[in-house]
Amino acid sequence: MATKDTGGGQQKATRSTEEVEEQAQDAQASEDLAERQEKLSDDVDSVLDEIDDVLEENAEDFVRSFVQKGGQ
C-alpha cells in the first residue's frame, strides 16, 4: 500500500529580507512620529503657558478684546 505525504511536516518561521526591512522602516517611522508628537506637545504647552501669562497680567483687557461690539 502506498502512503501519501500530506506535507504536514514542520515549517520554519523565516522572514524574508523584505519583511525585515519593512519592519525596520516601520520602527523608524514610529520613532519619528514619537519625536514629532513630543515636539508638538512641547509647543502646545509653551503656547498655553504664554496665554496663562497674558491672562494673569491683564485678563480684563484680554476678555474685552473678544467681546462683540455693536451687535457684530
From Swiss-Prot:
Location of Deamidated glutamine modifications: 72
Pathway listed: Protein degradation; proteasomal Pup-dependent pathway
Region spans: ARC ATPase binding: 28-66
Residue stretches of biased makeup (Gly residues): 1-10
InterPro entries the UniProt entry points to: Ubiquitin-like_Pup (IPR008515)
Single Gene Ontology BP annotation: proteasomal protein catabolic process
Cystine crosslinks: none
Region feature Disordered, mapped onto this chain: 1-45
UniProt biased composition (Basic and acidic residues): 33-42
Post-translational modification, as annotated: Is modified by deamidation of its C-terminal glutamine to glutamate by the deamidase Dop, a prerequisite to the subsequent pupylation process.
ATP-binding among keywords: no
Coiled coil regions, renumbered to chain: 10-60
Numbered residues of crosslink Isoglutamyl lysine isopeptide (Gln-Lys) (interchain with K-? in acceptor proteins): 72
GO function terms (MF aspect): proteasome binding; protein tag activity
Keywords: Coiled coil, Isopeptide bond, Ubl conjugation pathway
Domain comment, as recorded: The N-terminal unstructured half of Pup provides a signal required to initiate unfolding and degradation by the proteasome but is not needed for pupylation, while the C-terminal helical half of Pup interacts with ARC to target proteins to the proteasome.
Subunit and interaction comment: Strongly interacts with the proteasome-associated ATPase ARC through a hydrophobic interface; the interacting region of Pup lies in its C-terminal half. There is one Pup binding site per ARC hexamer ring.
Similarity comment: family membership: Belongs to the prokaryotic ubiquitin-like protein family.
Role description: Protein modifier that is covalently attached to lysine residues of substrate proteins, thereby targeting them for proteasomal degradation. The tagging system is termed pupylation.
Name this polypeptide is given: Prokaryotic ubiquitin-like protein Pup
Organism: Streptomyces griseus subsp. griseus (strain JCM 4626 / CBS 651.72 / NBRC 13350 / KCC S-0626 / ISP 5235)
Gene name of the record: pup
